[in-house]
Amino acid sequence: NILYTVRSNDIAMLVDDRLVVLLEHQSTINENMPLRLLEYVSRVYEQLIPIRTRYKKKAMKLPYPEFYVFYDGKDSYPAEKTLKLSDAFIVPEKKYLKKKNISLEILVKVININIEANNSILKHCKTLEEYSTLVELVRESKQENPDSSLEETLTKAIKNGILSEYLQRKSSEVRNMLIA
């Protein structure tokens, strides 16, 4: 079930008893993702939990959050990396953190889905692998022939079985996403 859409590419969904927040794709490296996802998950919890329930004496049971970012940008990036909100905190003395637990933490798993990153997730998820292949096709097409149309690239992808069913159904949406 989709609970909340932050932007057209951001999504939050319930899976079993967990709240999984996905940023479907990030084409630029953004070390502020933990902060942004903290904001997103706060909004999701606001929608899930009635106001009156938040003020009851007994603790609420909340869906467990997991945070993922799919990176498909051009800059070099490891196959997987964990970003931590606490890395952004201004702490007067580093030794303070050793003695005291951090009161607020968000861990974001950034997964590089570029074909050349050779991430194992692509072997396990055909759709994601095809998406990554499509992104690579678009890049190659722009580099080889800047005048070639996006339409030609999408037609080539469909002919090669790359997200063909999806591209046939949603070609205008995909075109708009790739142009943005």
Locate the predicted segments by residue.
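Elongated, amphipathic alpha-helical interaction scaffolds
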Residues: N1-A180
